[in-house]
């Protein structure tokens, strides 16, 4: 479980970024959303110790992040940054994914097993000898996820994972997140994309001006007037509301509910 207890964060200039943050995330897929500058990335960087609270505590499975280094917390909370290109430096995909497990001091047999498993999880089997730099945007994003998965953290943070992806890349990302969820990975997703939230999230945490404005099930989140938070309501939700239908995530579910 990830727990924030009265967490505050501010910079040296006195600007408050997070104010009295309290919530518990027990597992599944959590989307963290909100306007630009609301504190989303600051919040998730506290989960693996990249930032420490100025006040309050972040507890991950009973471990206070104040008491551990970033390296120690990264074994528990994996972090995939917004721009995956910055992560890549090896000559091929296999070596890229193997780097993390090797740093853990694992045997080559275990390293290879983890690499094959991680690539399979993200749909990149057969890419082992490819250069990371020649992959498409969607493939690079999935490779970045595989690199973290191979370390086998319990929690996986994806910071704006769909930035720069075309429709095909986005569909591939959605499929990967769904598969990870089915395989019992716990995912924390930072995004502005409400379509992505609708497709994959179990719970949503909404930030504005450094404060939590909503935390709860995704179906309750989409009952809010998202215009108040500079967020765009998905067309599927608009249609469902106009027709007074139950909560639906996508076109396929909408068709089933309507009975077409």
Curated annotation (Swiss-Prot):
EC class of the enzyme, as a word: translocase
Database matches in CDD domains: ABC_cobalt_CbiO_domain1
One GO CC term, this protein: ATP-binding cassette (ABC) transporter complex
Subcellular location field: Cell membrane
Annotated EC: 7.-.-.-
The ABC transporter domain, residue ranges: 2-234
UniProt keyword Membrane, yes or no: yes
One GO MF term: ATPase-coupled transmembrane transporter activity
Main location: membrane
Residues reported to bind ATP: 34-41
Entry keywords, A to Z: ATP-binding, Cell membrane, Membrane, Nucleotide-binding, Translocase, Transport
Membrane-topology descriptor: Peripheral membrane protein
UniProt cross-references to PROSITE patterns, sorted A to Z: ABC_TRANSPORTER_1, ABC_TRANSPORTER_2
InterPro entries on file: AAA+_ATPase, ABC_transporter-like_ATP-bd, ABC_transporter-like_CS, ABC_transpr_CbiO/EcfA_su, Co_trans_ATP-bd, ECF_ABC_transporter_ATP-bd, P-loop_NTPase
Cross-referenced Pfam families: ABC_tran
One annotated GO biological process: cobalt ion transport
Xref: Gene3D superfamilies: P-loop containing nucleotide triphosphate hydrolases (3.40.50.300)
NCBIfam families, per database record: cbiO
PANTHER family: ABC-TYPE COBALT TRANSPORT SYSTEM, ATPASE COMPONENT, HEAVY METAL TRANSPORTER
Family recorded in the similarity comment: Belongs to the ABC transporter superfamily.
Role: Probably part of an ABC transporter complex. Responsible for energy coupling to the transport system.
Name listed for the protein in its UniProt record: Putative ABC transporter ATP-binding protein PYRAB01300
Native source organism of the sequence: Pyrococcus abyssi (strain GE5 / Orsay)
């Amino acid at each position: 479980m990830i727990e924030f207890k009265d967490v505050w964060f501010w910079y040296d200039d006195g600007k408050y970024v997070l104010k009295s943050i309290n919530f518990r995330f027990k597992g599944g897929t959590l989307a963290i959303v909100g306007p630009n500058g609301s504190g989303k990335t600051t919040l998730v960087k506290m989960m693996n110790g990249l930032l420490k609270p100025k006040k309050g505590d972040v507890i991950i499975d009973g471990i206070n992040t104040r008491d551990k280094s970033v390296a120690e917390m990264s074994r528990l909370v994996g972090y995939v940054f917004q721009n995956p290109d910055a992560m890549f430096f090896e000559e091929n995909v296999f070596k890229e994914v193997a780097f993390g497990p090797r740093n853990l001091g694992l045997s080559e047999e275990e390293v290879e097993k983890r690499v094959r498993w991680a690539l399979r999880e993200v749909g990149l089997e057969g890419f082992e000898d490819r250069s990371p730099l020649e992959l498409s945007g969607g493939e690079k994003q999935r490779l970045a996820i595989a690199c973290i998965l191979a370390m086998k953290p319990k929690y996986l943070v994806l910071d704006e994972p769909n930035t720069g992806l075309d429709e095909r890349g986005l569909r591939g990302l959605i499929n990967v997140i769904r598969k990870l969820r089915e395989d019992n990975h716990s995912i924390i997703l930072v995004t502005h994309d409400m379509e992505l939230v609708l497709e994959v999230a179990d719970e949503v945490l909404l930030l504005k001006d450094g404060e939590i404005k909503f935390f709860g099930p995704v179906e309750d989140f989409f009952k809010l007037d998202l215009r108040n938070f500079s967020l765009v309501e998905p067309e599927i939700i608009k249609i469902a509301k106009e027709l007074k239908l139950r909560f639906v995530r996508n076109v396929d579910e909408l068709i089933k509910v309507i009975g077409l």
